[in-house]
Amino acid sequence: MFARISTIITTLFFAMLAAATAVPRTDPPPATGSQCTAVGGDVNCCNSVQDASNPIVGLLAGLLGIVLGPIQGLVGLTCNPISVIGGGNSCSSQTVCCTGNNFSGGLLVIGCSPINIDL
């Protein structure tokens, strides 16, 4: 009886150990400003970046009379375009590359992804 319980406990221990083993992430690194413009995107400084499925995004789109449809990914809120080339630009919020539509002067921008840029 003790051998059976010992075997079960040992098996469970190794199963939990295997489940807790760290696996490296395979996410691609964020794009840079030059990669953004190469794909036809615009570099923006957004006060907030939300998942498209966030109810706040749907509420804001509804208030603006925008029909977004089934979109996925990130949506920038209250965004201002910034130039990759030249000085004087700064972004104290989230720097993103947006390849989708820009609504209401940057209040809502779809198709955004975070980028690394030194401003």
Curated annotation (Swiss-Prot):
Belongs to the fungal hydrophobin family. The keyword Secreted applies. It is found in: Secreted; Secreted, Cell wall. Residues 1-22 form the signal peptide. The lineage of its organism: Eukaryota, Fungi, Dikarya, Basidiomycota, Agaricomycotina. PROSITE patterns: HYDROPHOBIN (PS00956). Disulfide bonds join C36-C97, C45-C91, C46-C79, C98-C112. This is Class I hydrophobin 2. Changing T11I: In strain: Horst 97. Transmembrane segments: none annotated. It comes from the Eukaryota. GO terms for molecular function: structural constituent of cell wall.
